[in-house]
Amino acid sequence: MMYIGNDIVEVSRIHRIFKMYHDHFLNKVFSEKEINVVKQKNKDAVYLSGKFAAKEASKKALLSSGIVENISFKSIQVLNHKNGAPYIDLNGIILKDVKDFKVSISHTNTYATAFVILEL
């Protein structure tokens, strides 16, 4: 069975939140591994918006599947392979029914969007 999640985020909204709440926002939404990437590579609001949209889309797919009742954003890590392709890692949560988890992220300077396919 396949489940999908989709999300779109205004980059300006994430920029405002990041500017106002910087570390609080990062610590509430992103894992330690994700925060390290943001800080080491000096990533901007466009990058954060894409990752945030991917987390939202992943959460929607997971919740619609019924395999979880709730999941935190920090538990959904959006990381990148060496070739730059994004992937989802559930930060140590083992969901035995998950066969595959695919994510695609796109953005402009105005919007970021993500689409996720969860296969059980």
Q: Can you annotate each of these PLM segments?
A:
Residues 1-120:
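Core catalytic alpha/beta fold that binds nucleotide/phospho-ligands
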